[in-house]
Amino acid sequence: MSEAKRLAAEKAIEYVEDGMIVGVGTGSTVAYFIDALARIQHRIKGAVSSSEQSTARLKQHGIEVIELNHSGNLSLYVDGADECDANKCLIKGGGAALTREKIIAEASERFICIVDPSKQVPVLGKFPLPVEVIPMARSLIARQIRDMTGGQPTWREGVVTDNGNQILDIHNLQITDPEKLERELNQLPGVVCVGLFARRRADVVIVGGEPPVVL
């Protein structure tokens, strides 16, 4: 699948325009995008990064990393996904960067999601849904989510997000109404961010292949 990821990332470069500050996500597919972006870095002003991992890779290539507080709204955000449905709703957060990813997506006029074909699903939920939580609320939220959804929350032990929080992964879900579940989970006290990107879903999905498919 690495070649499919690379092809999706290369296709996304076509959406980068001169003078842009580009929002950059996190993950293995985005790593290919950062590498491709490095080849045209003379055309862009810099990048807003969603994680320390992506920041390090951008800086390795000499791409200027700009804080979102200083960049203002962005024209373009490119990120991957753990799952993607036919309506361009996503599950994200396998790399634990979901909160910053969602913030940058919200700040961006256009959100391009780059995936390999294995990430396309008819119904979201086979991939465990990540939820970033305040540490003291972890057990409470796990019980509430179990009661609310029937899913099985597990604590991603040993993982601390860039924001200093913890991750619950919710297994055994069939998410037929992603926007509703995103809204309901967001209302639980102690939830920082839900890894459902439904209210702010992708505008374009690029599925890597020969040739890449643009949805």
Curated annotation (Swiss-Prot):
EC number: 5.3.1.6
Pathway: Carbohydrate degradation; pentose phosphate pathway; D-ribose 5-phosphate from D-ribulose 5-phosphate (non-oxidative stage): step 1/1
Gene Ontology CC annotation, any one: cytosol
One GO MF term attached to the UniProt entry: ribose-5-phosphate isomerase activity
CDD domains per UniProt: RPI_A
InterPro entries: NagB/RpiA_transferase-like, Ribose5P_isomerase_typA_subgr, Ribose5P_isomerase_type_A
Catalytic activities: aldehydo-D-ribose 5-phosphate = D-ribulose 5-phosphate
Binding site for substrate: 26-29, 79-82, 92-95, 119
Taxonomy, superkingdom: Bacteria
Organism whose genome encodes this protein: Stenotrophomonas maltophilia (strain R551-3)
One Pfam family, short name: Rib_5-P_isom_A
Record key words, sorted: Isomerase
Similarity-based family: Belongs to the ribose 5-phosphate isomerase family.
Active site, renumbered: 101
Biological process (GO), any one: pentose-phosphate shunt, non-oxidative branch
Protein name from the UniProt record: Ribose-5-phosphate isomerase A
